[in-house]
From Swiss-Prot:
The keyword Membrane applies. Residues 489-519, 570-590, 627-686 are annotated as: Disordered. It is found in: Golgi apparatus, trans-Golgi network membrane. It comes from Candida dubliniensis (strain CD36 / ATCC MYA-646 / CBS 7987 / NCPF 3949 / NRRL Y-17841) (Yeast). This is Pheromone-processing carboxypeptidase KEX1. Residues 565-686 are cytoplasmic. It is a single-pass type I membrane protein. PROSITE patterns: CARBOXYPEPT_SER_HIS. It catalyses: Preferential release of a C-terminal arginine or lysine residue. Belongs to the peptidase S10 family. SUPFAM superfamilies: alpha/beta-Hydrolases. The lineage of its organism: Eukaryota, Fungi, Dikarya, Ascomycota, Saccharomycotina. One of its GO terms (biological process) is apoptotic process. Gene3D superfamilies: alpha/beta hydrolase (3.40.50.1820).
Length: 686
């Protein structure tokens, strides 16, 4: 009888795990080794109201022949009432910058405090769908490989291989709606990956299933590089950062005109389908921002306030950092991820030291044989909604540049936004937070009071972007303006009168979309109906399971009570140490067990199998500069030793002109230099 209660509890635990509605068909044995059940501060700083998410993480093998492993970290909401059949893949840019920036500074459930512990981010996107952060290309963050890739087509192919491996691990999710989201240089990655998925869906092989791609969200994206750079001088002038009387105005204007000639040449050959060197090389145009930051520095101010922050023009930084010391919490992320216990908790096979950006990946990834992703947007917009959102304070990927290339772009039968002046106000939580243009499946959203990293500044607002792209908003007249109204999580009114009058897929994806897209709309409607039916069936089944569990619990309690009551008093002995311990152990268990808590025991099964490898203790990466600044890191000056350190993503144009090449002094330099090809000659170089 002494083993009955523990056995009964394990039985109940098994039933509860099997009752999770959207986890049907999962293989716990396969996924078990990727479970994340603990992190520094997880159980101390995350309150029951916040709820601990269900987490899986690890390095998935995608190409054994090159030892290529992609690191992923997945977050799911542990609150069963808010579970959705939606998967969001998040990518950061660089190239070569880790998506852990997104996970721990932007859209994930946690931020990192100064004690290198997790604390709650109340604007996490995992409340709107399972979100998976992936370090890619290979070599980025915790991902690793014996070889590095060089072009955007490879990015797409590698990610498709990752998705195959991911869905082998989580086969129950293969029918989920899929969205891709990211920022900065991910504006190149995401369109290429999305296009590859759509092409794959059209030529499936036997046994393959369609990936239900529903849309892409690109924040402050580096989509049309030279067109974006052409916006720098107008942006500075329009925001009062420089004027025509500045002594360097003529010099800046001359460089702006040089860039304009390059853009004109690109426009003249835009549709010929050829990769032109003058389009994939953007160093001439990017030099404008380098000069602007130099010429506008305020030497009379404090040393750390002399340069305009290129990621948020309302902030200041030291020169030549100019924003690369931002955001402030970035200094907590690296030490957190470099803790050996955290590496083990994230199930790393290779205990690789984490760096925010990998210079070797950036140097190798030239993208000289790939047309910029702006060319792919029209084809994507034929099948899925494309959302381009921008923080209004960003310089490096500013809104003016995005609108400039969109107004030239032809998609779905028209050029640019036809009604550019017909702006739609975006209202969130009774506040106007931005405006949007939305036509023919492409939307542009300008978000007030936010930077290059919108989710960092406005986490709650950024999460509502998911509501916009999925149609979970109300269309209203607010203060005399047409407005799309979104709400804090869970507070949207659910009556028919308040629901969005444009609920059909054709209007949800695009209020002004033409009838020529009816086939796409019909397909989306069918998929939505199917998903709804599936959810309903799953919900009913889950309720039956839960009812059965409750009945079993009552039965178990009754059996235990009856068995003790029926014992003769002569055989009831004083509890021994062992029985006392059992009693305390069982009665000390939590009665209201959360999903993530239930799975804590899995960590114990693996603890004895973990490696004893230590952290690779090397110096932080240093940079000595580059001439070709396209998509590369900007060197950041160290005031004490006149050295340069890694930039966060897309600081490519801010470099010392006297510096010839990047030399990364990080843990990567202790490894053998990766083989790569010279994009211009295709010859192997070391």
């Amino acid at each position: 009888m002494k083993f009955l209660l523990p056995t009964f509890i394990i039985f109940i635990y098994t039933l509860l795990v099997s009752a999770l509605p959207t986890k049907e068909g999962s293989d716990p044995k396969a996924a078990k080794k990727y479970l994340v059940s603990d992190l520094p501060g997880l159980h101390d700083n995350i309150t029951p109201d916040d709820s601990i998410p269900l987490m899986f993480a690890g390095q998935l093998e995608i190409y054994p022949e090159s030892n290529t492993h992609y690191f992923f970290w997945k977050f799911s909401d542990s609150n069963q009432e808010t579970i959705t059949n939606r998967t969001i893949f998040w990518l950061n840019g660089g190239p070569g910058c880790s998506s852990m920036d997104g996970a721990l500074l932007e859209t994930g459930p946690f931020r990192i405090n100064s004690q290198q512990q997790v604390i709650s981010n109340n604007g996490s996107w995992h409340k709107s769908g399972d979100i998976i952060y992936v370090d890619q290309p290979a070599g980025t963050g915790f991902s690793y490989s014996d070889t590095y890739i060089t072009d955007l087509d490879q990015v797409a192919n590698y990610f498709l291989k990752f998705m195959e491996a991911y869905y082998e691990l989580f086969p129950q999710e293969i029918n989920n709606e899929i969205y891709f989201a990211g920022e900065s240089y991910a504006g190149q990655y995401i369109p290429y990956i999305a296009n590859a998925i759509l092409q794959r869906n059209k030529k499936l092989h036997e046994g393959e299933q369609k990936y239900d791609l529903r849309g892409v969200l690109i924040g402050n994206g580096w989509v049309s590089p030279n067109e974006q750079s052409l916006s720098y001088l107008p942006f500075f002038k329009d925001h009062g950062l420089i004027d025509i009387h500045h002594p360097k105005w003529a010099t800046l204007l001359a460089k702006h005109e040089q860039c304009q000639k390059i853009v004109n040449k690109i426009d003249s050959t835009f549709d010929d389908g050829t990769v032109h060197y003058y389009e994939v090389s953007s160093s001439t145009c990017e030099a404008i921002l380098t000069d602007l930051l130099e010429y506008t520095q305020d030497t009379a101010n404090d040393k750390n306030q002399q340069c305009i922050n290129m990621y948020d023009y309302t902030l200041r930084d030291s020169y030549p950092s100019c924003g690369m010391n931002w955001p402030n919490e970035l200094v907590n992320v690296g030490p957190f991820l470099r803790q050996e216990k955290v590496m083990h908790q994230l199930n790393l096979i290779n205990l690789k030291k984490w760096n925010e950006c990998n210079g070797k990946v950036g140097r190798t990834f030239q993208a000289r044989h790939s047309i910029p992703s702006v060319h792919l947007l029209p084809e994507l917009a034929k099948e899925i909604p494309v959302m381009l959102f921008n923080g209004a304070n960003d310089i490096i990927c500013n809104s003016q540049g995005v609108l400039s290339y969109l107004q030239k772009l032809q998609w779905n039968g028209e050029t640019g936004f036809i009604n550019k002046d017909n702006q739609i106000s975006w209202v969130y939580d009774n506040k106007e937070v931005g405006y949007m243009l939305w036509e023919r499946n492409i939307s542009f959203i300008n978000i007030y009071n936010s930077s290059h990293m919108v989710p960092y500044d406005l986490p709650d607002v950024s999460r509502a972007l998911i509501d916009l792209i999925t149609g979970e908003y109300d269309e209203k007249d607010v203060d005399g303006k047409k407005s799309f109204v979104t709400y804090p999580l869970g507070s949207r009114k659910e009556n028919d009168e308040s629901k969005n009058p444009v609920e059909s897929p054709s209007q949800t994806i695009d209020p002004i979309i033409s009838s020529s897209s009816s086939s796409v709309e019909s397909s989306l409607s069918s998929s939505s109906a199917s998903a709804t039916d599936s959810d309903s069936t799953s919900s009913k089944f889950t309720r039956l399971i839960q009812l059965a569990v409750i009945l079993v619990i009552f039965w178990g309690v009754y059996v235990l009570y009856a068995s003790y009551k029926s014992r003769p008093s002569s055989i009831i002995k004083k509890p021994t140490n062992n029985t006392s311990n059992i009693t305390r152990s069982s009665t000390g268990k939590k009665k209201n067990v959360q999903w993530a808590d239930q799975l804590n025991q899995f960590e114990d099964d693996e603890r004895n199998q973990e490696s004893n490898q230590g952290i690779i203790a090397k110096a932080i990466g240093k940079i000595t500069g580059s001439k070709d600044t396209r998509g590369r890191y900007a060197p950041v000056h160290r005031e004490n030793d006149n050295e340069y350190i890694d930039d966060i993503e897309l600081g490519e144009g801010i470099s010392d002109p006297n510096v010839d090449e990047f030399i990364i002094g990080s843990d990567d330099d202790d490894e053998e230099e990766q083989p790569r090809s010279d994009p211009a000659t295709h010859k192997s170089v070391s």
